[in-house]
Structures are given as C-alpha cells and as structure tokens.
Amino acid sequence: VIIAIYLLVLLFVLKVSYFDVFNRRLKDYQPVYNEIIKKHPDFKHHPYSYINNDNNKIQGEFYYYDLDHYHGLIINAHGMDNCKETQLARLEYFARNGYLIYSYDNTGVGESEGKNIVGLGHSVIDLRNTINHLATITALQPMKWALYGHSWGGYAVSCVSNYQLDHDISAIISKAGFNSVYDEFYFLGSQKFGKLTKLFVGPIMFFENLRIKENKHKQSVDGLDKTKANVLIMHSYDDPTVGFSITMKKYFPRLANKENITFKFFQDRGHVIDQNINSLGRYYSQHADKKEPHYQQHYATLLVKDMDHQLVLEQLHFLNKYMI
C-alpha cells in the first residue's frame, strides 16, 4: 500500500511538472529584425500565415532582399523559449547572399495561435505542416529547399524526414539538435537525479504521447538515415542543454559513414554554437525571467552583435555547395 501511494504521488508530481512546462504559451518577443534593419535597411519581411491541422494559425514571415533570382528557400525552425526572430542575424546573412527565408513561430509561441506549446515533440509536427503547406505555393515549387534549426528546431529538421513531405529537401543544418524526446528528457533529468531518472522518464513519456500521438517513438537518427538531403550536424561536447554523448551514441553507428552527412564538433561552444556564449549566456542567465521591452531589446542586440561570423560563413558555404 505504501509503495502504491508513493507511486501515485510520484505520478502526480511528474504530471504537474510536465504540464507546468508544456501547458503554457511562450510569449517571447525578441525584436531582432528591428535591430538588423538599423544596419541593413533593405532587408525586408512579409507576414505569411497558414491554418494547421489543429485549426490554429501558424504565423511566419518571409525575409528577403529584392533580387532577380534566389538560390533557394531556407525554412527556419526555432528553439525552445525562442521565436521566429531568434536566429534572424544568421538568416539575414543567408538572405544577403541570395536566399529566400521563411521563419515561423511554433504552435503556442509568439504570434502563432494555440493555447500551449503541446509538448517537446511538437516542433517536428509544426515543421512538417509548414513544409507541406509551403509546397502548395506555386512560386516556391521550382526552388531548392533547405532546413535550418537549433536545439528544439535542430531536432525538428533532423527528425522531419520520418514523415511524408510534399517537397524535396536539398540541405539540412542541425545545430545542437537532440535525437529523440525520450533522450532529451533523460539527459535533462540525469543532470539532477542521475540514474534515478529512469524512474521518471517513462511516466513523462506517457504524458507526452497522450498529447502528441503522431510523434510516438520518432527519432532523428531514423529521419537522417532516410533523407537524401545533404546534412550538416553541429554540436559541442560541453552542451549543457542537449547532451552530446547521448545523441552521438545513437547517431554514429548508423550515420558516421553516410556520404550525405557531415559532422562538425566543438570543444567549448556550449549550446548556442555560433554565438559568443560568454556575453549572451551571462545576460540570459541574469535576465531570462524579465520580459520588459528594454531587456528583450538588449538581448536582441546581443543576438546580432555577438554572432560568430566565421561559423555562419561556414554554414553558408555548406548551403551554397548543395543549393546552387
């Protein structure tokens, strides 16, 4: 009886913890676009939304420079506690070098509808829906397409080839993406609870699978193994948010010898690989809970100012190799 009571209490605590994280909207607004156009006034944007399978409006933006020709379309999938503008300094650089960009807010984030963010696995559902909707736009159909994602978005771009996609994908860049929802929950839990985490992950996955039936048992390694796209996987050994070892333990046996997949590893770049992690990380850790406009504006300034231009240039070279 005591054990049964203990298990019920544990299940209740885990349920409350899970819903505390995912039964909410993310209202982050990071005004990166306003920061960028101070230096690049010709960088334009055009709002574009669609209605997803759950009858929620997914709000995105096309970002571009007026050009006679675009090398292709890059679809950006954002990370957790981020929004469609978080990666915009990098996306502007790609746009400046000939690409059309589409970036969107996930369900329950920013300007998109949805009463909550559903669950950790929902980012790949949002990406699949976005790809298949954009595939109906005649002007985009002849273009080559690339996927670009960090963290939650890195998982999405890696995993999405498990689904039926209505347009071919030529290139994928995944930065600090995790292999599966289970692996990510396990890694985050093990940092606090060690091996006891095994007791928690099963019930948490039960709640996750109740909310996202379409994503049950989906892994990035399966999507990457299936895709014909050329893939760049970037990850740092010291990533505190998405475990390097737990991810590569799944990736390497199946992907290391695939000609279309390139790995690029770092020793000390943390979770945000192509950013000056010292200034950005310090500021975010001090002000993560502050949503006032002046804090968000300063964070946006750092996102633009402290971008690692050399690493973003390497990403551009990868895109150009397979998109032009």
Q: Which sequence ranges carry the predicted segments?
A:
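Conserved alpha/beta-hydrolase "acid-adjacent" motif
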Residues: P240-I246
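The serine-hydrolase catalytic nucleophile loop
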Residues: M80-Y93, N106, S245
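An N-terminal hydrophobic leader/cap segment in hydrolases
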Residues: I2-I51, I58-Y63, S285-Y299
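Short beta-strand/loop motif that positions the catalytic acidic residue
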Residues: T227, I233-D239
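Conserved alpha/beta-hydrolase
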Residues: L91-E113
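C-terminal catalytic histidine-bearing segment of alpha/beta-hydrolase fold enzymes
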Residues: K258-I324
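Alpha/beta-hydrolase active-site loop
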Residues: I117-T138
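Hydrolase active-site cap/lid region
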Residues: C159-E214
